[in-house]
Amino acid sequence: MTETASGPARGSRAKGTKTTKGLRIERIHTTPGVHPYDEVEWERRDVVMTNWRDGSVNFEQRGVEFPAEWAVNAVNIVTSKYFRGAVGTPQREVSLKQLIDRIVKTYRKAGEDHKYFASPADAEIFEHELAYALLHQVFSFNSPVWFNVGTPQPQQVSACFILAVDDSMESILDWYKEEGMIFKGGSGAGLNLSRIRSSKELLSSGGNASGPVSFMRGADASAGTIKSGGATRRAAKMVILDVDHPDIEDFIQTKVKEEEKIRALRDAGFDMDLGGDDITSVQYQNANNSVRVNDTFMKAVENGDKFGLTSRMTGEVIEEVDAKELFRKMAEAAWACADPGIQYDDTINQWHTCPESGRINGSNPCSEYMHLDNTSCNLASLNLMKFLKDDGKGNQSFEVERFAKVVELVITAMDISICFADFPTQKIGENTRAFRQLGIGYANLGALLMATGHAYDSDGGRALAGAITSLMTGTSYKRSAELAAVVGPYDGYARNEQPHLRVMKQHADANAVAPRADDLDTPIWAAATESWQDVLRLGEKNGFRNSQASVIAPTGTIGLAMSCDTTGLEPDLALVKFKKLVGGGSMQIVNGTVPQALRRMGYQEEQIEAIVAHIADNGNVIDAPGLKHEHYEVFDCAMGERSISAMGHVRMMAAIQPWISGALSKTVNLPETATVEDVEEVYFEAWKMGVKALAIYRDNCKVGQPLSAKTKDKEKAEVTAKAEETIRTAVEKVVEYRPVRKRLPKGRPGITTSFTVGGAEGYMTANSYPDDGLGEVFLKMSKQGSTLAGMMDAFSIAVSVGLQYGVPLETYVSKFTNMRFEPAGMTDDPDVRMAQSIVDYIFRRLALDFLPFETRSALGIHSAEERQRHLETGSYEPTEDEVDVEGLAQSAPRAQELKAVATPKAVTEAAKPAPQQAHTSAELVEMQLGIQADAPLCFSCGTKMQRAGSCYICEGCGSTSGCS
C-alpha cells in the first residue's frame, strides 16, 4: 500500500498533530524504467460514425492510434467524444497517448505544486500508474475530465452540481442563470425548491404567491432552449420538493397532466415522439422530478394517519392531508409517467458527514450525488471485471490487494483535481474547495456477478456486491485520512469532526454485521473490516481530506469507453450482445461471462458449448441442454424471458447503500402490466431497507417512447382442447393439397397509400380479391431507376405471387416486421410512427388494413386508436358495441376507403422475426424478444438507447441523456 514520509507540519489542522512531508507511491502495474505505452501493441484505426436513420456521416477521423486490444466501440467513442482540437487541423489529437498524457501530466504537475508527493520519483510513479490504469481501462474519470483537463478552456472536472434557490425573485432569476451556465458546459444540476413559498401563501404586497411549480416552467423552458441551441444531449436537470410543501400535490401532477396533453396532441396528428418537432410545446419535459419524504410522512402512511403541510414563511401547518392518499397519488403519477421519483430525507441526512455546515436538501439529476447546496462532485468509476482473476478452469478470486491499491491511486488523483479545477459559479467553487467531495464508484457489477456464478437477485450476489462496495469506500476514506496527514483536512472538518467520525462508525458497524456468503466474498469482507478499522484510527488522528468519498453513478459514456458489459450497479441487459468488428461489420456474440459462470458452477466444456449454442439461437437459457434449473437464475437479465423482478433491484440497492457516501443512480424497471400497488411496494420497501433514493419506470408509460409490441399470452389459455384439435385437423388438411395459384380478376378493388419512411417517399398499391383478402402488392419509390426502386419492384412481384399461391399475409407480417435497414426512422403515418425499414412499414400497414384484430394483435401490431384505448382501459380490444374500423378511422387522411375482407382461416403459429442486423445490444434484444425496448432514439446517431442508472446511454456513439 501507499506509505507516507515524515516531515514538517503544513496546512490547517483540526487537531494538533503534524502533517507529513508527502506520499510515497508504490508501483501496482508498472515496471521501473519502462513506460506503460512501451508495453502495449499499438495500431492505427479509422473511425467513421454514421447516422443510421439517414446514412449521413456524423463523425470521421482516420488513422487514430489505439492499443490493438481496444474494442471498436471504445475506440469510436473515445475518439469522437474525448479527442480535442478541430478534426483536420494540427491541433487535433490523433492518439490515445496524447489524450492520456494531457490528463496525467496535468494531475502530476498539480500534485507536485501542492506538495502531495514525497519526491519527484513518487510523482513519476504516480503518473505512470495513472497512465497504465487509463490505458488498460481499469478505471475512468468522468467525462468532464476527458473533455477539459489539459486544454486551454476552463478546467471543469465535475459532472454533478447541486444548486440552491431562496424565496426571492433575485434568487429565482439567479437559479435560471446558474443552471443555464452548467447546461452550457455539458453538465447537469439539481436543486430543492421547497424554500419557495407556496401558491397558498400571501406575498408581502397582499397577493397570492406563484408557487414553485410556476417557476419550474421558466427553468424548464430555459433548459429546452439551451438543448435546442446545439447541445448533443438534452439538459440533465433535477427538481425536488419536500413532501410537506403545500404545493406538493400540484408538483406530483405536473408531468401527469403534460403526458395527457401529449396523448391528445399525438392523436391529433402532431409529432410527439422524443425529439419530435412538436414535443417542445409541452412543459416540464427537461427535468427529473423527485419528492423528498421524511420518516414522519412514511410512518403516517404506514399507520394511515394525517400529515401536515407547512407554511414556508411561518412553519405552521396550514393544511392536513391523508398521508396514505398522498402516497397513493405519488405512486399513481409514477405509474403513469415515471415521475416523480422518491428521496428519503431522514435516511440521507442520517449519513451526512457535515450537518453543522447545513443539511442535505438536493441531489444531482441522476440522484447519486447528495450533499450541501451549491457544491459539486467529480466522479471516477472502476471496471470491476479487471479485478477478477480467472484461470479458465472455474477457479476464480477477486484481487483484493490490487483493487485497494487502485482505489488509493484514484482517490489521490481525484483530490488533486480539486486543486486546479474551475467551477461554473463562485459559490460552487468556494464550497467544493472547502468540502472536497469525491465520488468514486464502479461499473460492470452485473457482469462480475454473472461471471462468478451469482444471480443478481441472490444472497450470494448481494454479499459479493456489498463486500466490494465496503472495501472501496473504506479504502477511500483511509486514503482521505492519509491525505489529511499530508496536505490537511478539508476546511469544514473542524466544525464537523464529531458527525464525520460518527458516520465513519456507522459504515464500520454495518460492515461488521453484514452477512458473508462464500469463498469469493469472505476475503473481501476481511480486507474491508481492516480498512474500516484503519479509517477510525487514522481519522481520529488526522481528520479527513474529503467530506464524501463514493457514489454509484450511471457510468454511461465512460462505461462504454472501458468496454464494460454493464453500467453502474445494473444487471446485464441480455445474454447475447452486438459487437462491432475491426474493419467494419458486426456480429452477435454470447456474453463472455456465460461460459465463465458455467465453469465456475462445474460444467464440462462439452456441456458449456451446448448451452452457449442454445443461448445464441434462443437468447435465453430456458430448456438449455444440461443446464440445471436451479442455475437458471444466474443468467437472469434486465430484459427477456427471465427478467429480474423490481424488488430484486431494490434488494441489491439496499445491499450496497450502507457503504456509499452518497447514493445510487438507479431506476427500477417495472413491466407494463405492473400496478399502482407495485409502485407503492417499491417505494415503501426501499424506505424500510435504508435506500436513499430511487425512481421507477413502467414500460410504455410514456407516449413519447416507442410502444411495446409484445404478444399477449392471456388469450392462449382460452383455447379449449376441442378447438386445438380442430386447428390441428385444419392444418393437416391444408398441407395435404398442392398449392394452386388463384389469380385476381381483371377488375379488382384496391387502395393506394403514399408514405414516407426516414425521408424516403413511396407509394403502395394493395389489391384484393373481391371476397377473399389481399392478392397483390405494388411498391413504387420516388426515384425510378434507382437500385432501391428496382429491388422494391422485384420484392412486390415475389410477395404477390406468394399471396396468390396461398401464403397467409400474417406469415409475411411475422417474417418482415422489425427487419432493419436504411432508409428507416420517422413516418408520416399516425398508426406507424416509427419504422425500422420500408419493408417493416409496408407489412405493418398491410396488417392494419387487411388482418383481423385478433390475428394482428397476436403479432403485436395495433393502431394508434387501439394503443390509446389500452392506455385508458388496459385493453387493446374494441368494446362489444364498437366496430373494428381502426384502419378506417386512423387512415382518414388517405382518400380511399378499403372494405374489410376476411382472410383464410388456416391457423399458423406466430413466427419470431427472422435474424436481422442490429446496431446495438438494445436493438438485438428487441429482435430476440419481438418487442420494442422502451427507450428513446439517440439524438446524435439515431440508434436505440438503453438504460444506465437514471439516464439513457447510446451504445452506438456514447451519447448520454444524463450528466456522467
Which sequence ranges carry the predicted segments?
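Extended catalytic cores of very large enzyme megasubunits
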Residues: 1-804, 813, 830-832, 932-935
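Acidic, low-complexity intrinsically disordered tails
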Residues: 8-15, 708-748, 856-940, 948
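Hydrophobic alpha-helical membrane-spanning segments
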Residues: 691, 695, 847-855, 949
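Residue-level signature of catalytic and energy-coupling elements of molecular machines
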Residues: 759, 842, 950
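Phosphate-backbone binding interfaces of nucleic-acid-interacting proteins
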Residues: 775, 782-867, 872-874
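Short cysteine-rich clusters marking metal-coordination/redox-active sites
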Residues: 938-941, 954-957
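Short Cys/His-rich "knuckle" micro-motifs
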Residues: 947-951, 964
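Short Cys/His-rich micro-motifs in 6-15 aa windows
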Residues: 958-964
